[in-house]
Regions:
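Generic signal for short, ordered secondary-structure residues
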Residues: 16, 33, 69, 119, ...
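Conserved Switch II/interswitch segment of TRAFAC-class P-loop GTPases
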Residues: 42-47, 74-84, 95-156, 174-184, ...
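Conserved G1/Walker A P-loop phosphate-binding module
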Residues: 1-113, 141, 147
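C-terminal-of-GTPase-core extension/linker across diverse P-loop GTPases
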Residues: 2-8, 13, 19, 146-355, ...
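Short amphipathic alpha-helical segments
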Residues: 30-31, 112-116, 217-219, 249
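Amphipathic alpha-helical transducer elements in NTP-driven molecular machines
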Residues: 34, 48-51, 61-70, 84-98, ...
Length: 366
């Protein structure tokens, strides 16, 4: 499954700097390349040391990591919900993304002009939130009118949708995002997903700080933490300008040394992608052999047939069973044959819930 994250924020907060940091071929580690698809769209690999270990064991012809698409969306301005500036295109680009990376300026620099005159990341957050909420309110009101009418005419599904839309309307009118509305059951979750509302998308607040605040943050970051504490959001602190400069260094060990000097064990890009996985409830399973070792992305809770379908739809349609080896067992025993002989290869049916790190082989018939 593809994962697309959109970088948003006001002008001059560091969106393009973050994108450039990610876009460096050395932004994460020696073997994590970045492919520029368009000037504002790229695809970067998901860092996973387990895949590297499997490749060392299997020595395959090719190793294929999971990927994340990153979109640098044009800076939002007040009035975007009315189509001002690049508003319409901005909102359309967000709608296509699975998650929002909301960059907030958390550094002082007199040489970098702020559109509102001074640095205030909480205010900046509220500006973006308001524009998205206004657009969502327009969408909700239009769909609520139709769903309400159909529900009163006896359409049970429309009635359920109308009930959820009514709760969204109350939240939006109170200045809250749709993601703040509790969903009552899986059925409502499915309805919510198909509404494609902007403020329902998972969000990570990326606090762009100065070099001295890279490890521990600063007062601006703490203000953001307080403002979003009830949002179920991820927060990432990154000195994007500094990390972009470090990413240009050729030698991997030298880059790591500079990160350590900042008090960091891993680059902000690695932490960003890991945070996006947590935010979206994603996990990884592997296929491993002499021809290929590959990481595959699924949702936490997905069952074996669903995982098979990520590889090919025919695998899901004709699913018979899955052979599963736990990652730690494979690393300890080195081969599928050894795992089978040791009783560490399990045969699982269609109700098996895939675990993070499972190494899987699917049997199917079409």
């Amino acid at each position: 499954m593809g994962l697309k994250c959109g970088i948003v924020g006001l002008p001059n907060v560091g969106k393009s700097t973050l994108f450039n940091c990610i876009s460096s071929g050395r932004a994460q580690a020696a073997n994590f390349p970045f492919c520029t698809i368009e000037p504002n769209l790229g695809s970067t690999n998901v860092p996973d040391r387990r895949l590297d270990t499997l490749s060392e064991i299997c020595k395959p012809e090719r190793t294929i990591p999971a990927t994340v698409d990153i979109v640098d969306i044009a800076g939002l301005v007040r009035g975007a919900s009315r189509g001002e500036g690049l508003g319409n295109q901005f909102l359309a680009n967000i709608r296509e993304c699975d998650a929002i990376l909301h960059v907030l300026r958390c550094f002082d620099d007199g040489n970098v002009v702020h559109v509102d005159g001074n640095v205030d990341p909480v205010r900046d957050k509220e500006v973006v939130d308001l524009e998205l909420q206004i657009k969502d309110l327009e969408t909700v009101e239009a769909r609520l009118a139709k769903a309400d009418k159909a529900g009163k005419a006896g359409d049970k599904e429309a009635k359920k949708m109308a009930e959820l839309l009514a709760r969204y309307k109350v939240a939006l009118e109170a200045g809250k995002s749709c993601r703040s509305v509790a969903l009552l059951n899986d059925e409502e979750a499915a309805i919510a997903k198909n509404l494609f509302l902007l403020t329902n998308k998972p969000v990570m607040y990326v606090c762009n700080v100065d070099e001295g605040s890279a490890a521990s943050g600063n007062a601006y970051v703490e203000a953001v933490r307080e403002a979003v504490k009830d949002e179920n959001a991820e927060i990432l602190v990154i000195a994007a300008k500094t990390e972009a400069e470090i990413a240009e260094i050729e030698d991997f060990d030298e880059r790591q040394m500079f990160l350590e000097d900042l008090g960091l064990e891993e680059s902000g890009v690695v932490r960003l992608i890991q945070g996006a996985y947590r935010l979206l409830g994603l996990q990884t399973f592997f296929t491993a052999g002499s021809d290929e070792c590959r990481a595959w992305t699924i949702h936490v809770g997905d069952k074996a047939p669903k995982a098979a379908g990520v590889i090919h739809t025919d695998f899901e349609k004709g699913f018979i069973r899955a052979e599963v080896i736990k990652y730690d067992d494979f690393v300890a025993l080195k081969t599928e044959a050894a795992c089978r002989a040791a009783g560490k290869l399990a045969t699982e049916g269609k109700d098996y819930v895939v675990k993070d790190g499972d190494i899987m082989h699917f049997l199917f018939n079409v």
